[in-house]
């Protein structure tokens, strides 16, 4: 959610800090700020506007320096306001500020610490839990910032990534992480901190991924890391090539539109070099794990949860293995019955989703040790924590509403389905060849659906004036209806709900009027005739149907029923293909309504706090 950038160098780092914040804007924020060491003093500029305006303000204030930190904030404690924006300073009494600090996460015992610090004379200027950490570090400071931070984090309960520097030690930045991502960037006589390697693209490609409990001391020519026990540790540096072109719009109006149209490439890349189905696609030892398990437990949040629901249909019908799909934030607090023979599958675009990581640690504590993740970031915490992994190749996704990450997750989960089926003797050579042929044609099939954009834009003009919408699907297309409803509400702010079409008579039909658009996914599968009956129920109540129907489904335009014909029925992979028009409908409806498509209100791209 929030973003951190920090640096210590022998050159003016202000442009690096500002550019880093710009690269982190996609994560979502409501305020931003930068602090630097200048001529023996701490100086800062903060804003509740965009980073571009902050940059102008920094130039007007003539800020510059060799040591500093910067931050984009997403409000958790305290309203979006300049006095709550980071960086926070700490001084005792009327002294000049000595400590500057930024923080991502939530400190659960901040009220207790606040009272303690107020009792020894610290005055709070904000409503944030972050200012508590700044004052705590200052209170514990006795000439060594690294030692003060180590002492301070031992007092913190909750999740955090912090970056801090001190007026009295101007060539030093200290960072720490627990449950929130933080990376170190290595340079020549300069070093950097960030919450995401993307922030350092163009500055360094040498990245160290800190682990939970790590505290790092950055100086000009030295990086020193200690673990939770205070023991010095070595963390491997990775060469990370971040393609900065992902942050360029090109001919597109928004990043979401660009990413929708990148899906043929993203799905093709995710399938790259796959010539046959084998468990080893998911890592060494996958065959043994797949033979030992008797069920799957899928843990995910948001859009990734809907990918898991879709996979349940595939895995149970093709591989014949029972599957449970759980919302990660709920599962970890539920008194569930652990099964040590289950394969736990986590799904996350970033690999840093706090609730999913916490649920993963929870199941491992219950003795469930077979773990696999489907993730878009090879260096993420989730990949490091799991026994097996499949890395999607969606590329950087900047729009808050997930598009290409979702379809590449589905692609990877279908591969998992086939690998499980093969391991259990439920996939013949002929079936494998047929499925591989369909997968290889999938990018072209998605491209054919993207060509329907002009027709979908016409629907969006009708949708834009609505305040409610209903989405219907059956079978493996029901999770796609859920995803379609989520997309519409995320970016257009139209209230939308999704139901299995067979549930209409059990409540949702009461909402159907001539003012309620009903979006229906109508593939030519075994449930089509049942779905047609559900559609007639909507028409009989005056509802207006918007139907995505396969070409040979014999559903035609009529009064109260608008039909867009999909190019072809795509069998088991139909849910992936039917996702695309729902993305386009949501996108163009939001455009007509004039919302901030890439940065919808109140939402963040990467949810790294619980």
From Swiss-Prot:
Membrane-crossing residue ranges in chain numbering: none
E.C. code: 2.6.1.16
Main localization category: cytoplasm
Span of domain SIS: 286-426, 459-600
Catalytic reaction list: D-fructose 6-phosphate + L-glutamine = D-glucosamine 6-phosphate + L-glutamate
Annotated localization: Cytoplasm
One annotated GO biological process: fructose 6-phosphate metabolic process
Domain Glutamine amidotransferase type-2: 2-221
GO CC term, one of those recorded: cytosol
Function noted in UniProt: Catalyzes the first step in hexosamine metabolism, converting fructose-6P into glucosamine-6P using glutamine as a nitrogen source.
Protein name, entry field: Glutamine--fructose-6-phosphate aminotransferase [isomerizing]
Lineage of the species this protein comes from: Bacteria, Pseudomonadati, Pseudomonadota, Betaproteobacteria, Burkholderiales
Protein encoded by which gene: glmS
